[in-house]
């Protein structure tokens, strides 16, 4: 298709593009036509600056759309904006940018309207019409963002389908205003809305305060229908949308109505009825879809995404996120929505507690995933729940909690529906309506969880001897459950089993459905042979502890053994081996820790801090550290984030190269200090590969490497099979048999990785 690009001089350029072209590809085409380097181009559409890694279709840019080209004059710089939640945002700016421009950039990143932003620098509030240079704001300065809330409040509107909408309102809003807000969110015309509160229908001319509707009140929305018929559309998240349609409506019309209600572009929608995908040009009556039929909506996705957060009260919050958001960012968004401080939030996914510094994509959290939010309560008590697989779950409870509440908490942690749970204590099955104190269950008591199963599917497990075992399972079974079933059949203890599917080792806490294991899939069973061994753990005080372990023990198990010996809670322990911080879910053998190896134990003192690391490419990385962290620890964190081996890193602060064995506090490195990272290269060269999620991978290559070799290196790092990879450079797709030097790809060039998804759909 053709699009137009209009420059500030009034000149209009015509480009030939595809909807799947990235903004970067478009900039390369502009460079071909006009000679303007991509890093000096800023493209604007519908008032929004376009990001390199996103595609034209992500921004709904269609044929004959006009983009605006603004030039970034040399002397761009980065500044930081710190919010009250402690989150730090990085912005690309020019000294000549106005405060208004900066607020618009913050809106693009964080979604906060400019009129709710107050920016503070050097204790002074900044005025919209002034520039950064007026205030002497230079590169790497930190501004502080304070929100101006205006006496508004939130209310909820519940529809007959069970969907709950959240609205921002004022007590002085009329019912008419509220209906207009519902129309903005849901596309329902006001004249089809009836609002009910406390059993009373609300009149248009009256205000919320007339009806004593206060913050977090729930109104009920009933539709007044006329003609036509209703059908339901069910999404993968279980949400049901109600549509008003005619039998003669085409599938295309239906997708347009879904777009009006939910904002999902038609080209991202696939509709299924009676197991069949519906074609755009056909009508509802062609498919015999009648009133109150239910269609299923499956999304073809790319770019930003929605996730859900479910609280223990059953409330579900919807968040707009990117796969590259950290858990810390997510907690800040929850604080913005719900007012819960991040340090009281624990987020659980697939039965695992999520760590602040990791990203959503690290945990394979995808669009429309549901996280569970558990509050760390002051008071209360802890109890343990032991499953038949030997796994122990820790719950925060009150003595007055009912058994039903406890089962709900187990569901939040493990995803097991309450009606499949039986809880046993002191040999007795516990009844739903009774409380923990009725059964004299006290702090640190252990309950036993037995599952009642139903339904399910068969899978096969193939051993190295060629024997195939058949198992009855549920998609919601954890890998741990599967190992317990193998133990029942074959007598092999779970801790000696490693299960492999699609070339990947399966982790105990994840479920079969997490790995997309379906009926009649075949898993491969590899045995971990016994051999207990001793390792040593050395503390900063010089004390050495001896532990009895197995190579298959996880780092979590090791921390539990240290807690048994020394009383140090696992969440205050950081274990270091060979200069690398060890992750809870990995095993000793994953890190090649052998008998009589020595680990180093560093305590996480409350009161970590953030520092910044700036690379030669201008990229800034944010790290969570302690003043007591060694330079070695910091390099390990950089390796975790960027994949750069510690022995290739040189860190510079205040003009001095930092030595591995010294700590941050030795060098007086304080919160928000910026270190500089210089790479020591040996032979070869480095290139960068940028994914659509914005993640950048660093690869060591030779100019003579083929594109095929490069794809193999990406597979080693990211696990993406070569036949699903398309590599783009300077707007051109690279062919497997050609070399990097054929394409003039030099050191520190950036390639773009686009995935080819099974079934010919491109993401």
UniProtKB/Swiss-Prot annotation:
Example of a GO cellular component annotation carried by this entry: nucleus
GO annotation, biological process: larval midgut cell programmed cell death; macroautophagy; modification-dependent protein catabolic process; protein ubiquitination
Protein's job: Ubiquitin exists either covalently attached to another protein, or free (unanchored). When covalently bound, it is conjugated to target proteins via an isopeptide bond either as a monomer (monoubiquitin), a polymer linked via different Lys residues of the ubiquitin (polyubiquitin chains) or a linear polymer linked via the initiator Met of the ubiquitin (linear polyubiquitin chains). Polyubiquitin chains, when attached to a target protein, have different functions depending on the Lys residue of the ubiquitin that is linked: Lys-48-linked is involved in protein degradation via the proteasome.
CDD domains membership: Ubl_ubiquitin
This protein's name: Polyubiquitin
Pfam families noted in UniProt: ubiquitin
Gene name for this UniProt entry: Ubi-p63E
Site keyed Essential for function: positions: 68
InterPro entries: Ubiquitin-like_dom (IPR000626), Ubiquitin-like_domsf (IPR029071), Ubiquitin_CS (IPR019954), Ubiquitin_dom (IPR019956), Ubiquitin_ubiquitin-like (IPR050158)
Entry annotated with the keyword S-adenosyl-L-methionine: no
């Amino acid at each position: 298709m053709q699009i137009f690009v209009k420059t500030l001089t009034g000149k209009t350029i015509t480009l030939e593009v595809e909807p799947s072209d990235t903004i970067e590809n478009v900039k390369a085409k502009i460079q071909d036509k006009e000679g303007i380097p991509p890093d000096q181009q800023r493209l604007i559409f519908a008032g929004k600056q376009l990001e390199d890694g996103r595609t034209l279709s992500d921004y709904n840019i269609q044929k004959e759309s006009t983009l605006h080209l603004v030039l970034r004059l040399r002397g761009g710089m980065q500044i930081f904006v710190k919010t009250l939640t402690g989150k730090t945002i990085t912005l690309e700016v020019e000294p000549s940018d106005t405060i208004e421009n900066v607020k618009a950039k913050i809106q693009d990143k964080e979604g906060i309207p400019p009129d709710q932003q107050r920016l503070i620098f050097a204790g002074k509030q900044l005025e919209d019409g002034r520039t950064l240079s007026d205030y002497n704001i230079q590169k790497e300065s930190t501004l502080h963002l304070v929100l101006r809330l205006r006496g508004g409040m939130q209310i909820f509107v519940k529809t007959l389908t069970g969907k709950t909408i959240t609205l921002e309102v004022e007590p002085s809003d009329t019912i008419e205003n509220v209906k207009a807000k519902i129309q903005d969110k849901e596309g329902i015309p006001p004249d089809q809305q009836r609002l009910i509160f406390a059993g009373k229908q609300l009149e248009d001319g009256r205000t919320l305060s007339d009806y004593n509707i206060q913050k977090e009140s729930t109104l009920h929305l009933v539709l007044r229908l006329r003609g036509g018929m209703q059908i339901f559309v069910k999404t993968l998240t279980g949400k049901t949308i109600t549509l008003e349609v005619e039998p003669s409506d085409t599938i295309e019309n239906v997708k347009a109505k879904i777009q009006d209600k939910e904002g999902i572009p038609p080209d991202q929608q696939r509709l299924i009825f009676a197991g069949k995908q519906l074609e755009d040009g056909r009508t509802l009556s062609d498919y015999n879809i009648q009133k109150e039929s239910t269609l299923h909506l499956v999304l073809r996705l790319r770019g930003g995404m929605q996730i859900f957060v479910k609280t223990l009260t059953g409330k579900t919050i919807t968040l707009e996120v990117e796969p590259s958001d950290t858990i810390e960012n997510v907690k800040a968004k929850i604080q913005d929505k719900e007012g819960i401080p991040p340090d009281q939030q624990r987020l659980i996914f697939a039965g695992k507690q999520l760590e602040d510094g990791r990203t959503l994509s690290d945990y394979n959290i995808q669009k429309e995933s549901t996280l569970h939010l558990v509050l760390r309560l002051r008071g209360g008590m802890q109890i343990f729940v032991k499953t038949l697989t030997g796994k122990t779950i820790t719950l925060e409870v009150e003595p007055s909690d009912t058994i039903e509440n406890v089962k709900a908490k187990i569901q939040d942690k493990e995803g097991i529906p309450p009606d499949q749970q039986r809880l046993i204590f002191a040999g007795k099955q516990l009844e739903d309506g009774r409380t923990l104190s009725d059964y004299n269950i006290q702090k640190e008591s252990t309950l036993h969880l037995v599952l009642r199963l139903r339904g399910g599917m068969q899978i096969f497990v193939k051993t190295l001897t060629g024997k195939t075992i058949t198992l009855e399972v549920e998609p919601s079974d954890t890998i741990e459950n599967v190992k317990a079933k193998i133990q029942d059949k074959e007598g092999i203890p779970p801790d000696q089993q490693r299960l492999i599917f699609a070339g990947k080792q399966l982790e105990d806490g994840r479920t079969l459905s997490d790995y997309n294991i379906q009926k009649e899939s075949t898993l491969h069973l590899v045995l971990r042979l016994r051999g207990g061994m001793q390792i040593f753990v050395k503390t900063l005080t010089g004390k050495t502890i001896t532990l009895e372990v197995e190579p298959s023990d996880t780092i979590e198990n090791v921390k539990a053994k240290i807690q048994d010996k020394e009383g140090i809670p696992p969440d205050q322990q950081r274990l270091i081996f060979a200069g690398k911080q060890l992750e809870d879910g990995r095993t000793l053998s994953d890190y090649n820790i052998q008998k009589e190896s020595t680990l180093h134990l560093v305590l996480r003192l409350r009161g970590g801090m953030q520092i910044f690391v700036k690379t030669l490419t201008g990229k800034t990385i944010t790290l969570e550290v302690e003043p007591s962290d060694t330079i070695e620890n910091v390099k390990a964190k950089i390796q975790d984030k960027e994949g750069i081996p510690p022995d290739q890193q040189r860190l510079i602060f205040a003009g001095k190269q930092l030595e591995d064995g010294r700590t941050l506090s030795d060098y007086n490195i304080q919160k928000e200090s910026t270190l500089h990272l210089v790479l020591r290269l040996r032979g070869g060269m480095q290139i960068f590969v940028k994914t659509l999620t914005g993640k950048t991978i660093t690869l060591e290559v030779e100019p003579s490497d083929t594109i095929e070799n490069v794809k193999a290196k990406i597979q080693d790092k990211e696990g993406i099979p070569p036949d699903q990879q398309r590599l783009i450079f300077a707007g051109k797709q690279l062919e497997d048999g050609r070399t990097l030097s054929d394409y003039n790809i030099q050191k520190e060039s950036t390639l773009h990785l686009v995935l080819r998804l099974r079934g010919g759909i491109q993401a």
